[in-house]
Amino acid sequence: LGRRLEWPDNYFTLTNSVSYLNYSLQDWNSGLGFSNGNANSFTFNTTLARRSLDQIMYPSSGSDISLSVTLTPPFSRFRNLDYATATPAERFKWIEYHKWMFDAKYYLPLDSKKKLVLEAKAHFGFIGSYSTEAGVGPFERFYLGGDGLAGGFNAFLLGQEIIGLRGYENNQITPPDYANFGRSNNG
Protein backbone atom coordinates (compact mmCIF):
# COMPACT_ATOMS: atom_id res chain seq x y z
CA LEU A 1 0.00 0.00 0.00
CA GLY A 2 1.41 3.34 -0.93
CA ARG A 3 0.46 6.91 -1.47
CA ARG A 4 1.94 10.15 -2.65
CA LEU A 5 2.30 12.74 0.08
CA GLU A 6 1.54 16.39 -0.54
CA TRP A 7 3.70 17.69 2.28
CA PRO A 8 6.41 19.01 2.28
CA ASP A 9 6.18 18.69 -1.53
CA ASN A 10 4.64 16.41 -4.16
CA TYR A 11 7.79 14.31 -4.61
CA PHE A 12 7.31 12.34 -1.36
CA THR A 13 5.77 8.86 -1.14
CA LEU A 14 5.00 6.57 1.78
CA THR A 15 4.61 2.83 1.22
CA ASN A 16 3.82 -0.01 3.62
CA SER A 17 3.80 -3.77 3.19
CA VAL A 18 3.31 -6.93 5.23
CA SER A 19 5.08 -10.14 4.26
CA TYR A 20 5.30 -13.77 5.37
CA LEU A 21 8.06 -16.14 4.24
CA ASN A 22 8.63 -19.77 5.17
CA TYR A 23 12.12 -21.17 4.70
CA SER A 24 11.80 -24.97 4.54
CA LEU A 25 15.29 -26.43 4.72
CA GLN A 26 16.11 -30.04 3.88
CA ASP A 27 19.78 -31.09 3.65
CA TRP A 28 20.78 -27.44 3.17
CA ASN A 29 24.54 -26.94 3.41
CA SER A 30 25.43 -23.28 3.14
CA GLY A 31 26.77 -22.24 6.54
CA LEU A 32 23.44 -21.44 8.21
CA GLY A 33 24.24 -23.52 11.27
CA PHE A 34 21.38 -25.93 10.58
CA SER A 35 20.46 -27.91 7.49
CA ASN A 36 16.97 -29.25 8.30
CA GLY A 37 13.94 -27.43 9.66
CA ASN A 38 11.59 -24.53 9.07
CA ALA A 39 12.15 -20.83 9.67
CA ASN A 40 9.30 -18.32 9.50
CA SER A 41 9.61 -14.62 8.77
CA PHE A 42 6.69 -12.26 9.32
CA THR A 43 7.67 -8.67 8.49
CA PHE A 44 6.23 -5.18 8.30
CA ASN A 45 7.99 -2.69 6.02
CA THR A 46 7.52 1.04 5.66
CA THR A 47 9.42 3.29 3.26
CA LEU A 48 9.51 7.07 3.07
CA ALA A 49 10.96 8.26 -0.23
CA ARG A 50 11.49 11.45 -2.21
CA ARG A 51 12.07 11.12 -5.95
CA SER A 52 12.54 14.17 -8.16
CA LEU A 53 14.28 12.61 -11.17
CA ASP A 54 13.81 14.13 -14.59
CA GLN A 55 13.78 10.64 -16.18
CA ILE A 56 13.38 7.21 -14.61
CA MET A 57 15.65 5.19 -16.92
CA TYR A 58 18.58 7.55 -17.51
CA PRO A 59 18.27 10.45 -15.07
CA SER A 60 20.33 13.55 -15.72
CA SER A 61 19.09 15.74 -12.86
CA GLY A 62 17.25 15.40 -9.58
CA SER A 63 17.50 13.12 -6.59
CA ASP A 64 16.22 9.80 -5.27
CA ILE A 65 16.28 9.44 -1.47
CA SER A 66 14.63 6.73 0.64
CA LEU A 67 14.54 5.48 4.22
CA SER A 68 13.17 1.98 4.71
CA VAL A 69 12.49 0.10 7.94
CA THR A 70 11.66 -3.61 8.05
CA LEU A 71 10.50 -5.02 11.38
CA THR A 72 9.50 -8.43 12.66
CA PRO A 73 7.62 -8.94 15.91
CA PRO A 74 9.99 -9.49 18.87
CA PHE A 75 9.26 -13.22 19.06
CA SER A 76 11.96 -13.81 21.70
CA ARG A 77 9.82 -11.80 24.15
CA PHE A 78 6.82 -14.12 23.60
CA ARG A 79 8.56 -17.49 23.37
CA ASN A 80 9.54 -19.50 26.43
CA LEU A 81 12.88 -20.67 25.01
CA ASP A 82 16.35 -20.86 26.51
CA TYR A 83 18.39 -19.46 23.62
CA ALA A 84 21.69 -20.53 25.21
CA THR A 85 20.83 -24.24 24.90
CA ALA A 86 18.43 -24.19 21.92
CA THR A 87 19.47 -25.62 18.58
CA PRO A 88 19.68 -23.21 15.63
CA ALA A 89 16.53 -24.78 14.15
CA GLU A 90 14.67 -24.00 17.40
CA ARG A 91 16.17 -20.50 17.72
CA PHE A 92 15.22 -19.47 14.20
CA LYS A 93 11.81 -21.09 13.94
CA TRP A 94 10.54 -17.50 14.15
CA ILE A 95 13.06 -15.05 12.68
CA GLU A 96 13.30 -11.68 14.37
CA TYR A 97 15.20 -8.55 13.42
CA HIS A 98 14.88 -4.89 12.57
CA LYS A 99 16.55 -3.69 9.39
CA TRP A 100 17.14 -0.07 8.43
CA MET A 101 18.16 1.07 4.94
CA PHE A 102 19.01 4.54 3.69
CA ASP A 103 19.68 5.19 0.00
CA ALA A 104 20.45 8.49 -1.67
CA LYS A 105 21.30 9.34 -5.28
CA TYR A 106 21.87 12.80 -6.66
CA TYR A 107 22.30 13.62 -10.35
CA LEU A 108 24.00 16.81 -11.48
CA PRO A 109 24.30 17.72 -15.18
CA LEU A 110 27.80 18.94 -16.02
CA ASP A 111 26.93 20.46 -19.40
CA SER A 112 23.97 22.40 -20.78
CA LYS A 113 22.73 19.50 -22.96
CA LYS A 114 22.73 17.07 -20.01
CA LYS A 115 24.94 14.61 -21.88
CA LEU A 116 27.56 14.50 -19.12
CA VAL A 117 26.12 13.79 -15.66
CA LEU A 118 27.70 13.36 -12.24
CA GLU A 119 26.02 10.79 -9.99
CA ALA A 120 26.73 10.88 -6.25
CA LYS A 121 25.22 8.11 -4.16
CA ALA A 122 25.22 6.60 -0.69
CA HIS A 123 23.86 3.28 0.59
CA PHE A 124 23.65 2.56 4.33
CA GLY A 125 22.16 -0.41 6.13
CA PHE A 126 21.83 -1.70 9.67
CA ILE A 127 20.37 -4.91 11.01
CA GLY A 128 19.78 -5.53 14.69
CA SER A 129 18.03 -7.87 17.08
CA TYR A 130 15.57 -7.22 19.87
CA SER A 131 17.37 -9.58 22.24
CA THR A 132 21.06 -10.21 22.88
CA GLU A 133 20.27 -13.86 23.66
CA ALA A 134 18.46 -14.49 20.37
CA GLY A 135 20.88 -12.52 18.18
CA VAL A 136 20.45 -11.83 14.49
CA GLY A 137 19.63 -14.90 12.44
CA PRO A 138 21.24 -16.12 9.22
CA PHE A 139 18.49 -14.68 7.01
CA GLU A 140 18.27 -11.14 5.58
CA ARG A 141 21.93 -10.42 6.39
CA PHE A 142 24.46 -8.14 4.70
CA TYR A 143 27.54 -9.69 3.07
CA LEU A 144 30.40 -7.36 2.26
CA GLY A 145 33.35 -7.80 -0.07
CA GLY A 146 34.17 -8.84 -3.59
CA ASP A 147 32.38 -8.30 -6.86
CA GLY A 148 28.85 -8.08 -5.43
CA LEU A 149 27.66 -10.94 -7.61
CA ALA A 150 28.90 -14.01 -5.73
CA GLY A 151 25.80 -14.87 -3.72
CA GLY A 152 24.00 -16.42 -6.63
CA PHE A 153 20.94 -18.51 -5.96
CA ASN A 154 21.64 -18.92 -2.21
CA ALA A 155 21.63 -15.15 -1.67
CA PHE A 156 18.30 -14.88 -3.46
CA LEU A 157 16.74 -17.69 -1.44
CA LEU A 158 18.00 -16.47 1.94
CA GLY A 159 17.32 -12.77 1.43
CA GLN A 160 21.00 -11.87 1.69
CA GLU A 161 22.10 -8.47 0.51
CA ILE A 162 25.52 -8.67 -1.12
CA ILE A 163 27.51 -5.44 -1.13
CA GLY A 164 30.48 -5.42 -3.48
CA LEU A 165 33.77 -3.91 -2.36
CA ARG A 166 36.72 -3.88 -4.72
CA GLY A 167 40.05 -5.15 -3.44
CA TYR A 168 38.55 -7.91 -1.28
CA GLU A 169 37.54 -11.47 -2.05
CA ASN A 170 33.86 -12.38 -1.98
CA ASN A 171 32.34 -12.43 1.53
CA GLN A 172 35.71 -11.74 3.16
CA ILE A 173 34.56 -8.87 5.36
CA THR A 174 31.77 -10.85 7.00
CA PRO A 175 32.27 -10.79 10.80
CA PRO A 176 34.31 -13.74 12.11
CA ASP A 177 31.59 -14.69 14.63
CA TYR A 178 29.03 -15.17 11.86
CA ALA A 179 28.49 -18.77 12.99
CA ASN A 180 27.10 -17.35 16.26
CA PHE A 181 24.51 -15.34 14.29
CA GLY A 182 25.25 -12.07 16.02
CA ARG A 183 25.84 -13.36 19.54
CA SER A 184 29.01 -12.30 21.28
CA ASN A 185 31.90 -14.74 21.78
CA ASN A 186 32.47 -13.26 25.23
CA GLY A 187 30.06 -15.63 26.91
Segments predicted by a language model, with ranges:
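C-terminal outer-membrane beta-barrel translocator/porin domains of Gram-negative envelope proteins
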Residues: 22, 26-187
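Transmembrane beta-barrel wall of Gram-negative outer-membrane proteins
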Residues: 1-34
